[in-house]
């Protein structure tokens, strides 16, 4: 509850001015320092360092030069010229020559107010611009015909409170001639959205919210479609993390490639980068913190293809290429982190698709940001981002002459889904029978389309049927719809159906839908009466343990929420018997909500698991969540049990014995190295040019693994360097080592917060919610503090990297080159 506001007094103002003066003094110290650059001609990765599929030729048309910025988005205008969005601010035009084998750079006037241009699209005689850090979508028009876009209008403000690039992203023209806007998870829905948008009424639907996710709102990444003027905003689908682009195939089906949270690797809520078939009303299950939905939730749609680690950027289908048919049908996906473009083959499977991927081309570095097929049928792509070197490339087919494209037809299942989707925004009371028939369709994607259609119809037109029909998949699907959009008064009827339900006769996978319906109903409307709770417990208690992890997941949560007397013992059994750390973390997370029934034996069994699991590996947050669980378990035990286990808690609170490479002896300074000393040699280095053993010795001598991670070794304090050679060339790697503050990933910058009580809190922001920020104040221990947004008087992001200057001054020239060669490989 917020404090009442009182008028400021004279002393308040003096205190505030004193705090602010102190803050400015600190900032002056923090921000001091300069960076230097070399004026030599800059060179993007040469084509001979790029490996493409047989039959394709890669050309480098232009490398960005000093003053041209880093390029992150692109589109072709009607004249065949390329317009690019710049990483920092502004737009530019790349003019191809007649042979399409070179390009000149021309900045566009009066576009500096467009900050961090993540998306550009030429359509409807306009240039649409997604300026993420300007927090708006713009429509630019060139009425004078001089190519300078004198008209620049904001068509939608989209407030964005993060520095991490999860704002407005790319835009694409859809087959319906509408503009599709791709938005990451740090942006709220626009106020002008259509109230009948297919994606609506979404909630977190967490049965057991984690206290460590407190303050998170229900923002999710989404895809909107807008009319040319930007007046109508329809939310098509949502539940994404940070999908950057969308693309449409020859059937008009939409696809996106969503980003992962690599810090979650090793935890049950980790979701790899994933290709999603995006359909009307699609819910894809991303939520904040530990609340990300698993792929199998009945109220969300599964991934079409998991693609592991990576950093998704541009997407494009080959339908506008002049390449062979298998490439015209393929989806091409750019991976900024791993320096590659994937080729995805999609095969119709009912109302959706199966997918398999292969590497189309890759290089090192090749941080691909965006790509488009040009008027000549060749693929053009740009590299860049985060201030890195940019290049414009062209990929052409060199094989046999091409046959004419093969016409394709739509599939019956997709046509049925499309028919159901017409009712996602349209009331059709006379079509309830048609919708109902498809609620039980064996195809998940058709069932989903039917449920969204049902939810859009007046509830009075189908509620009675949902409650009175005999049991079937259609009825169970309708009850999920009722749990989602019905009133609290409707839920008693849902519970009446669930009580006495023949659970034991259902296969494990068939239990997921009714179990999840119970969860959604309770999450949205609260617990049923005590009598109903007891009847549900009698039905559900015998079902656990099950051989299926997903069934156990839902059952355990429900039994904890319903306060089962047996769930404590059963949960500890599951915890001890599970073979994967992901399953164990999920069972432990749910078990930490059980506050009664603990004795010394059960507490010791959990302590034993904590002792074992503290060595589990994965992303940065594995250790964080282990520590949260330790604290949660300790807090729910009685004071007497805490006293009996005091020695165990003390032992668990001590750091593990050092497992990383030992710190090297202090070495004498060899030289205060500068970029000019080494840039020529570093720029010529090729991956694996020097031996791995030499590089490993240099890595140890520089103590890199004290803060960084390579493979399974090292720390998570700084960026993971495993694939850094896919993003940065030798020159860029040298720059980041010699001058670490020249370009820093915002995730790793410290921020200085002046609080209303005069405190100065400095550290790295590791958690963001609507009301609070979590600040890591000590990167070596992981210690954090939570601050309230309303208490922040001022904040200034640091510009200096936490990585000190001069770390390689104790290395010889050859050792530094060995280190760079290792990182490039």
Model-identified regions with their sequence ranges:
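Sec-exported extracytoplasmic/periplasmic mature domains
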Residues: 142, 228, 459, 523, ...
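Beta-propeller domains with acidic blade repeats across secreted/periplasmic ectodomains
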Residues: 39-423, 662-663, 667, 679, ...
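Long, ordered, helix-rich scaffold segments
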Residues: 384, 388, 397-698, 717, ...
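N-terminal secretory signal peptides that target proteins for export/translocation
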Residues: 1-20
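C-type cytochrome heme c attachment motif
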Residues: 378, 697-712, 720-723, 729-739, ...
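C-terminal substrate/ligand-recognition segments
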Residues: 372-377, 443-445, 516, 557-564, ...
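Bacterial N-terminal signal peptides
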Residues: 22-34
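C-terminal structured "cap/appendage" subdomains that terminate the fold
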Residues: 368, 376, 385, 582, ...
